[in-house]
């Protein structure tokens, strides 16, 4: 079971590879606002645990296990952002809120939130009622 820090690294590596075609230690460190030496230690651990293959000075690649988890972590993050947007959380708070909660929810809870988002998309009146409620509470 990966730790929250492991998840953050895998998620960033997945995003970097998806966007740039590669992920370097320096890019990961910059994206996570940590020291490159910390990333190197984590990458070595992720290599040992089978999430990626790391060769010093040659870069890294996700294994199928790492790619599958990376994709799921990105989807979780996007789902939580979508959910918070739907329930009317202020845009400038969404990213930090997602970062604060994403590692503390079980995959079962994430799946239920996905179901709820789908219900809300299929029933726009629910979202309108939430918007009206937010307006009423912000008086």
From Swiss-Prot:
**GO MF annotation: an example:** DNA-binding transcription factor activity
| GO terms under cellular component | cytoplasm
Q: Where in the cell is it found?
A: Cytoplasm
Per the record, the major location class is cytoplasm
An annotated GO BP? intracellular manganese ion homeostasis
Source superkingdom: Bacteria
Output the PROSITE patterns linked to this UniProt entry: HTH_DTXR
Domain HTH dtxR-type intervals: 1-63
The answer to whether keyword Transport applies is no
Query: Per its UniProt record, what Gene3D superfamilies does this chain match?
Result: Iron dependent repressor, metal binding and dimerisation domain, Winged helix-like DNA-binding domain superfamily/Winged helix DNA-binding domain
Residues that, per the record, bind Mn(2+) 2: 11, 77, 99, 102
Q: What is this protein called?
A: HTH-type transcriptional regulator MntR
Is NADP found in the keyword set?
Answer: no
Keywords, ordered alphabetically: Activator, Cytoplasm, DNA-binding, Manganese, Metal-binding, Repressor, Transcription, Transcription regulation
Q: Could you say which residues bind Mn(2+) 1 here?
A: 8, 99, 102-103
Pfam families in the cross-refs: Fe_dep_repr_C, Fe_dep_repress
Lineage, please?
Bacteria, Bacillati, Bacillota, Bacilli, Bacillales
**Stated family:** Belongs to the DtxR/MntR family.
**What functional role does this protein have?**
Central regulator of manganese homeostasis.
Q: How is its activity regulated?
A: DNA binding is strongly activated by Mn(2+).
Its assembly, as annotated, is:
Homodimer.
């Amino acid at each position: 079971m990966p730790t929250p820090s492991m998840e953050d690294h895998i998620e960033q590596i997945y995003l970097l590879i998806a966007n740039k075609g590669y992920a370097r230690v320096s890019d990961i460190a910059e994206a996570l606002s940590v020291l490159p030496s910390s990333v190197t230690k984590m990458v070595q651990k992720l290599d040992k645990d089978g999430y990626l293959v790391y060769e010093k000075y040659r870069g890294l690649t996700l294994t199928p296990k790492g790619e599958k988890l990376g994709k799921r972590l990105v989807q979780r993050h996007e789902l939580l952002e979508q959910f918070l947007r739907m329930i009317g959380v202020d845009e400038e708070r969404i990213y930090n809120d997602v970062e604060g909660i994403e590692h503390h929810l079980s995959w079962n809870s994430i799946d239920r939130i996905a179901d709820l988002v789908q219900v809300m998309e299929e029933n726009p009146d629910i979202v309108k009622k939430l918007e009206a409620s937010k307006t009423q509470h912000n008086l």
